[in-house]
Amino acid sequence: AFLAFTNARLMSGIDLILTHLQFGKRIQNADLIITGEGSADAQTTMGKVAYGILREARKQNIPVLLVAGHIADTPSLYTAGFSGIFSIAPGPVTLEKSMHPEFAATHLQRLITQICKLLQAFRV
């Protein structure tokens, strides 16, 4: 009733932000997008930031890599359209340890370095 009374419309948070930032314009010349979140699973495709970024990138056929501290249900993430899914954690690690800023920064840097080296190897 409030929406009708105020002549407003309902919009998800990520859609509001992407629209405000003119994200579609900003990525027009991108060859690849790398995005991330703490935990990636089937819920990622239900409106999380990474999925909003993926939706916009797919409109322009830009591949999207997803990095996350924890990954579950990779089949649904690939089905959604992510081109690659990578875990920041180098192996089994407690949630407490994985959230320590120094641990996260070290392993995120390691992972991004590996991804960049892989991309360089396949550059034509």
How would you describe each model-predicted region?
Residues 1-124:
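N-terminal loops that bind phosphate or other acidic moieties
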